């Protein structure tokens, strides 16, 4: 939609979180008439921002006023099955996400990243690479979307030469119909948010695949060829109008594949373009303590592919990768206290993310896990837990389910708080061993978000450090 068409249009914004308030501000600046409607209580900071913008809002439920709109912008935390959204659709009111709305205003090049795991690290890597290149080439790189800053907050200041690096969740993509990234990256797809998608991984995948639904000739799609679901989709449903670039850990697996790829061979990251393969940089220059594991190598390959597709200079890519030390709350090394290494993996909000962490940390660890369950199948990692974990300390709403799932596999202790869990882990850990905090659940039962959860874990560990 042309933003000019929004002048004078009544728009209901459902949800008064960060993205909802940002969307309302963008709409107001375009001359639309937004109304923000929050089912719960509007936070004081959000209320102050909306008053400053002159945006009306309501809280404690959705009034009949919201259905007087021509357009509805829905916040990512609100499912399409919510009664207010169903009523919008029943009345013929168009429902879009904040990402879709902001894309109508975007003049910059867009690199969109989605997937179950790795999207934050990949988006962070791509942003830092583009930022380093932009400092020399005279453009700016913006890090927006699910990574923290709403797209709507920054889009008005973007110029055509700039690059918007968007981390995108399935929730944000659900409401996209014309959103068209110049470069789309899919890291992987494994079961997550099954509570929202009725236990159907294919429904979840369809939301993720909306990232490329509007891509055309001249655009690029990058996907993890080692992921079975992604491979089946892109090899089975083509041909595609856009360019396809594959990534994977073994270059020999691409024999007979005509498309470009980024992979690994003989300890080097290698790139094939137009049938020619080049050694790009040694893997050892990228992977280091604090940033290790196959899952992070996948993230690096996706970042290299995206940077090459965006025309970023190779020296900026190599320099940024060699300097990268990881992302907070993603297998973050907190420190060695009481003779034990403590690792904060609070961003692990599903079983597959926990699996990746377990594969990286040495055997004999104590595992702290739990939170608000998302339809997790813990049985799928029982053998790995038996191999790598000495005991589990379970927290949150899911602690009973976790205890039941691993009964007979390893000892499980239940803790009423994260602070108590840290103390139990300290008592249980072996000298020279590790404690891994990898919840495999969402944080909203006990914390405001995974970042709050991770910070509280680190604080509890440091408070205990005087043992």
Curated annotation (Swiss-Prot):
Q: Name one GO biological process term.
A: cell division
User: Which EC numbers characterise this protein's activity in its record?
Assistant: 6.3.2.9
> Is Ligase there in the keyword field?
yes
SUPFAM superfamilies, per this entry?
Answer: MurCD N-terminal domain, MurD-like peptide ligases, catalytic domain, MurD-like peptide ligases, peptide-binding domain
In this chain, ATP is annotated as bound at 115-121
For this UniProt record, the keywords arranged alphabetically read as follows: ATP-binding, Cell cycle, Cell division, Cell shape, Cell wall biogenesis/degradation, Cytoplasm, Ligase, Nucleotide-binding, Peptidoglycan synthesis
Report the coiled-coil segments: none
The protein's annotated pathway: Cell wall biogenesis; peptidoglycan biosynthesis
List cellular component terms (GO). cytoplasm
What GO MF annotations does this protein's record show?
ATP binding; UDP-N-acetylmuramoylalanine-D-glutamate ligase activity
Tell me the InterPro entries matching this sequence.
Mur-like_cat_sf, Mur_ligase_C, Mur_ligase_C_dom_sf, Mur_ligase_cen, MurD
Role = Cell wall formation. Catalyzes the addition of glutamate to the nucleotide precursor UDP-N-acetylmuramoyl-L-alanine (UMA).
Which family is annotated? Belongs to the MurCDEF family.
Protein name per its UniProtKB record:
UDP-N-acetylmuramoylalanine--D-glutamate ligase
Q: Which organism is the protein's source?
A: Chlorobaculum parvum (strain DSM 263 / NCIMB 8327)
The lineage is:
Bacteria, Pseudomonadati, Chlorobiota, Chlorobiia, Chlorobiales
